[in-house]
A protein has these predicted regions:
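Chalcogenol-based redox active-site neighborhoods
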Residues: 1-160
Length: 160
């Protein structure tokens, strides 16, 4: 079943590079007690993700904070080392938490996994964005395959 407005974010452990090492991030603690703009994408260093999706959230950091967002997070089915390197490449440090869902457990629990095997990428996350307030989904925007519009930072700003 796909996550929907009013659902609680599933409990899972993601990974984030901290002090040069992968560190576990509990979704319960990360999303608890704060408003989070969450977005996910099929893969680090892929064209749309690198040219539009991540830069949009990095560039909208101040606007999102001004609208009450406490944290911005990007999730992808990649390992923490790749997500950390990509975050540096995208100048996301200090603005967007680059969270690795290495085994896809969180993505699967959300019901937002898709099979990208025909591209040599295995199981990946669909492209989406959410507003999560104290662990509860307030808005969810899932893109059609190949599309990029409702998961953008610009769209999230209209929902706050």
């Amino acid at each position: 079943m796909t996550i929907k407005v009013g659902d609680k974010i599933p409990s899972a452990t993601l990974m984030e590079m901290q002090d040069g090492k992968p560190a576990p991030v509990s979704t319960d603690s990360f999303f608890g007690g704060k408003k989070v703009a969450l977005f996910a994408l099929p893969g680090a260093f892929t064209p749309t993700c690198s040219a539009k999706h991540v830069p949009g959230f990095v560039n909208s950091y101040d606007a999102l904070k001004a609208k009450g967002v406490d944290a911005i997070a990007c999730v992808s089915v990649n390992d923490a080392f790749v997500m950390g390197a990509w975050g540096k490449d995208q100048k996301a440090d200090g603005k967007v938490h680059m969270l690795a869902d290495g085994n896809g457990d969180f993505t699967r629990a959300l019901g937002l996994e898709f099979d990208a095997s025909k591209f040599g990428m295995g199981k990946r996350s669909q492209r989406y964005s959410m507003i999560v307030d104290n662990g509860v989904v307030k808005e969810v925007n899932v893109e059609e395959p190949g599309a990029f519009s409702v998961s953008s930072a610009e769209h999230i700003l209209t929902e706050l």
